[in-house]
Amino acid sequence: MASVKFQPRGRSKGRVPLSLFAPLRVTDEKPLYKVLPNNAVPQGMGGKDQQIGYWVEQQRWRMRRGDRVDLPSNWHFYFLGTGPHSDLPFRKRTDGVFWVAIDGAKTQPTGLGVRKSSEKPLVPKFKNKLPNNVEIVEPTTPNNSRANSRSRSRGGQSNSRGNSQNRGDKSRNQSRNRSQSNDRGSDSRDDLVAAVKKALEDLGVGAAKPKGKTQSGKNTPKNKSRSGSVQRAEAKDKPEWRRTPSGDESVEVCFGPRGGTRNFGSSEFVAKGVNAPGYAQAASLVPGAAALLFGGNVATKEMADGVEITYTYKMLVPKDDKNLEIFLAQVDAYKLGDPKPQRKVKRSRTPTPKPATEPVYDDVAADPTYANLEWDTTVEDGVEMINEVFDTQN
């Protein structure tokens, strides 16, 4: 069964405007924004300051035995201020949209319009050669398609007149074949209806049905998830100050091993990151961005490959703060190593309850060269903390 068209037929209110140019298609599985340059604007229309617009993705698929089989997407070009996203400003991050512009273009609506349904799309031409894995979809001529349909209609009528003489002898065979073809046709119509409904929902026409346990039938296309245009970057590809250790991306993967200026976190914290027990309590004593910027000192130093930014911040935490004990236990915790497992003591028949004792923490000598967290116990009302964040990223 053929794939669903991008442009729905008829004069419905939710119809998508037609592009002036034939679409592009990537032959491999890479998204368009990774293979097409950001100045790929089709030539031949508008002035120099109007060479700006966007490519929008049209998802394609086929229905095969009631299942949806994904096909390579088509990408249609629209000038800025036209098309299905005419209200978006230039470079507004949107799924399925790739913004392009040529130097000298103005970031304002071009007013170049869209194509009429009776017009043939233009073959896009570019200043530079397209990549090998990008092809132009051959445009179709609406008038020729209508002429072919009329010729097929006339041919069908003439054949029906010639076959009418033999209907008497073949009526019984036709009745049997008709019942079988109706069964097959009903399945094809169900597949087509389901595919059209899915296409209209993807284009924003009509309200999408809420997910539930009910199913329309065995031929209903399955909703297979598709990855968005913007893919999630791995932790190692992000700047260090944007990383969040979680799951397989441990503290060592994101920030390196403990030592030197990186002196916070026990072995459990390093292994589990933000999912470690007690992390939320310890993080509650970390100053926010506004506190670092407006309540501390900011120093910069120009390096060979970037600018080094150093934040210095002091804060006084009351000793009775419920999260302070957890926080202090993580400072220089890597120097203590993993605690040895304690042997289980067999309980006697008449165990004697032991008085509860408060945990005692060993004092760890601070290294004045690398230590970035210090506390002063001489303060009467609490603990004074000094936080210096070293950032050597670009």
Curated annotation (Swiss-Prot):
Low complexity compositional bias, start-end: 143-166, 174-183
Coiled coil residues, start to end: none
Biased amino acid composition, Polar residues: 213-230
GO molecular function: RNA binding
UniProt keyword list: ADP-ribosylation, Host Golgi apparatus, Phosphoprotein, Ribonucleoprotein, RNA-binding, Transcription, Transcription regulation, Viral nucleoprotein, Virion
Chain intervals for the UniProt region annotation (RNA-binding): 18-148
Keyword Ribonucleoprotein belongs to the record: yes
InterPro entries: N_prot_C_CoV (IPR044344), N_prot_N_CoV (IPR044345), NCAP_aCoV (IPR042548), Nucleocap_CoV (IPR001218), Nucleocapsid_C (IPR037179), Nucleocapsid_N (IPR037195)
Protein localization: Virion; Host endoplasmic reticulum-Golgi intermediate compartment; Host Golgi apparatus
Free-text description of this protein's post-translational modifications in UniProt: ADP-ribosylated. The ADP-ribosylation is retained in the virion during infection.
Segments of skewed composition (Basic and acidic residues): 233-246
Family per record: Belongs to the alphacoronavirus nucleocapsid protein family.
Function summary: Packages the positive strand viral genome RNA into a helical ribonucleocapsid (RNP) and plays a fundamental role during virion assembly through its interactions with the viral genome and membrane protein M. Plays an important role in enhancing the efficiency of subgenomic viral RNA transcription as well as viral replication.
Subunit composition and interactions: Homooligomer. Both monomeric and oligomeric forms interact with RNA. Interacts with protein M. Interacts with NSP3; this interaction serves to tether the genome to the newly translated replicase-transcriptase complex at a very early stage of infection.
The protein's name in its UniProt record: Nucleoprotein
